Amino acid sequence: VSGAFEHTINMQFKGQFMRAFVLQGATPQIVLGINPKTMPNFKTIADLKGKKVGVSAPGSSTNVMVNFLLAKVGLKPSDVSIIGVGTGNGAVAAMRSGQIDAMSNLDPVITLLLRSGDLKIASDTRVIAESEKVFGGPMPAGCLYAPQTFIDKNPNTVQALTNAMVRANKWIQAAGAADIIKAVPEGYLLGDRAVYIDAFLAAKGSLSPDGMIPEKGPQSAFKALASVDEKLAVAKLDLTAVYTN
């Protein structure tokens, strides 16, 4: 599976042993942005108290980031109203119409709103240093993972997938905007090449250069999940079993 690193922890909690074996995204690439129309005088995260905050879906990683940022200024998740807005046109419309005062979301939504002046960045985990500040350590994101049984039975296949992904990681680090446009299928460009290129360039630094999963990454991911799941928070899990380099 190509998916979020934290799924390996969630699956172990449910009794299914998955292991991540090569990293794609070194950070979650989530951005918290403020609505300049409804919050023109925004100064700090504490100003979000009592406000409506859009997330891709309640309980998702975009919601987790909001919880972490609120906690840093002494606020509880219940101090804001969390509203699910998706990651597409609905999210853009919610921001532009003033239905929400802030939004925790991903590209291309963030870049679209930035370009039209409908969003002001408050926290940007596309920047590795900012991501580590928010989550208290490295927060691995997109990766390839598989059931431990598959890895044990198919070591050559797993190694081949790893080699291919590391080559892709290295190619992306060296690639320019024109290279990306040539390589990416038209359907992924969302009908707007300029937005896609802007989003890619903003996120490029958060893509893994070598596929290596950071040793402290599982702890950061566990803490993030524990913030939205009380049962998982008290579970005894083997975090060394959720990844391998």
Where are the predicted features?
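Short helix-capping segments at alpha-helix termini
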Residues: 72-78, 192, 232-234
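Secondary-structure end/capping motifs
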Residues: 151-233
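Pocket-lining segment of extracytoplasmic ligand-binding domains
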Residues: 90-93, 97-186
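Short, glycine-/small- and polar/acidic-enriched structural segments
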Residues: 1-87, 97-107, 111-112, 118, ...
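Hinge/cleft segment of the Venus flytrap/periplasmic-binding protein
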Residues: 234-245
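A generic alpha-helix surface/boundary motif
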Residues: 5, 64, 144-145, 178-179, ...
